């Protein structure tokens, strides 16, 4: 890709795009589940260990490769590993595509529940949330509609390239952090008698006996990759659209 063509306007555009790629169901949905199933604070030990010795260095390497090659994952692997390993670039591209399959579905659910929330359908203590969920799933037309709505919105966001993604991400990232901090604020104001404080303490309490369980370390390794999209080709792709004068380590 020639210098001066479609690129991010600045560092913040690239940072927001990278954060958007990293912060997804792997962090917001999967991470709490992994913490709960692997000993709370115990899980944080292998997660942080692999995050800094494997996932973050891998992300930096991906950015360096994409910035140098100025092409997609297939071309990048062909340049750095030879033609025989170009299939690895295709594999990483397929991983991101496969992830998009379920993201479209889950994002469709999210938009549906946003609609239910603003229309007041979820208000009140007598609302049967299980019934609301089942009614939605039993209506294939609605499920498909919201999934295709997500696909259409995504296409609209990426249609004009990196600069369009940069503009959309600015608002999406601000909205994401606002919602996360609002959730944190509300959780701190909850009645601790319902177990909220116990959950917070559990998250930062290490059970040293569990550190000898291989499953905890395996889950920590996999979660570290989910936490920053390491090895999924997204960083290689975004690096193509960064300026050659930009630092690889942001």
Per-segment meaning from a language model:
Residues 1-29, 58-63, 67-79, 86-87, ...:
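Membrane-interface "cap" regions at the ends of multi-pass membrane proteins
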Residues 10-50, 233-242, 246:
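Transmembrane helix-boundary motif of multi-pass solute transporters/channels
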Residues 50-55, 92-112, 174-185:
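Hydrophobic alpha-helical membrane-insertion segments
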Residues 16-22, 48-53, 91-102, 148-153, ...:
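Hydrophobic alpha-helical transmembrane segments of multi-pass membrane proteins
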Residues 13, 40-47, 84-100, 166-177, ...:
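Alpha-helical transmembrane segments and their helix-start/interface "positive-inside/aromatic belt" motifs
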Residues 2-6, 33-38, 68-91, 104-162, ...:
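Inter-helical loop and helix-membrane interface segments of multi-pass membrane transporters/permeases
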Residues 2-8, 12, 167-250:
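Membrane-embedded translocation segments of transport machinery
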Residues 6, 35-61, 88, 142, ...:
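Extracellular loop-to-transmembrane helix junctions
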């Amino acid at each position: 890709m020639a210098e001066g063509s479609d690129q991010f306007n600045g560092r913040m555009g690239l940072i927001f795009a990278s954060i958007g790629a990293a912060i997804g169901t792997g962090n917001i949905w999967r991470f709490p589940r992994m913490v709960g199933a692997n000993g709370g604070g115990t899980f944080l030990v292998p997660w942080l260990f692999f995050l800094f010795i494997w996932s973050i260095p891998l992300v930096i390497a991906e950015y360096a490769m994409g910035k140098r090659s100025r092409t997609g994952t297939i071309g990048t692997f062909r340049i750095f590993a030879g033609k025989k390993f170009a299939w690895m670039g295709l594999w990483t591209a397929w991983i991101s595509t496969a992830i998009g399959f379920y993201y479209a579905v889950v994002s469709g659910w999210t938009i549906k529940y946003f609609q239910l929330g603003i229309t007041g359908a979820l208000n009140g203590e007598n609302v049967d949330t299980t019934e609301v969920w089942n009614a939605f799933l039993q209506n294939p037309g609605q499920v498909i509609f919201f999934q295709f709505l997500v696909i259409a919105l995504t296409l609209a966001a990426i249609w004009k390239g990196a600069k369009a993604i940069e503009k959309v991400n600015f608002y999406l990232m601000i909205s994401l952090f606002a919602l996360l901090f609002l959730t944190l604020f509300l959780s701190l104001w909850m009645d601790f008698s319902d177990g909220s404080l116990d959950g917070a303490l559990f998250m930062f309490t290490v059970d040293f006996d569990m550190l000898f369980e291989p499953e905890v370390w395996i889950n920590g390794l996999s979660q570290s990759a989910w936490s920053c999209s390491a090895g999924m080709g997204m960083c290689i792709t975004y690096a193509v659209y960064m300026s050659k004068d930009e630092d690889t380590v942001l």
